[in-house]
Amino acid sequence: MIGISYLYHGTIDKYAADIIYNGVNLLKSKNHLDFGRGFYTTPDKQFAIETAKTRARAYNAFNKDNPVNPKVLVFECDDSRFAALTQKNFIIADALWAQFVLSNRCERQDVHEQYDNNLDSRYDVVSGPTADGRGTLTPIIHQLDTGECSIEDVNYTAFAPAKHWGKQISFHTNKALACIRLKRVL
């Protein structure tokens, strides 16, 4: 049970339309995200708005002839159905959270075998802090993937979220997605 009535997903209008007309398709999610391949939401409306704006700016920087607009999808939660799901919840950005994020994001098999991850969607839902995308995480992942460092060498506070970054709740199975329903678009 997550105890939240509404969740928000910040995106761009073309992807929002796809979700509105076809539903969430987990296969369209990118690999190597914080909590593994999944559909990412947040209980923080403002964080979702900022995410949508950031995604629109990034898309438009490379597609000036066909610009997109930010959109936020609002989902209602059926909290009674969450109890039947396999869940992992991180309250704070501590060492276990960092190892989980790094194991999901890097490509090294030995890291996947040594540390908990969600590459196989063993968790229906994962919640916790959003890793800071200020450019600190990508070099760390590169160092892990090339063997320049081990997870034990990583200072996880380097990519721990800033105070203003929101919590994320990710859905990794269709069973989990059945617990949320699209209500409106902002």
What are these regions (language model features)?
Residues M1-G3, H32-F35, I49, T54-L186:
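Conserved NAD+-utilizing ADP-ribose enzyme module
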Residues I2-Y40, Q46-R57:
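Glycine-rich loop/turn
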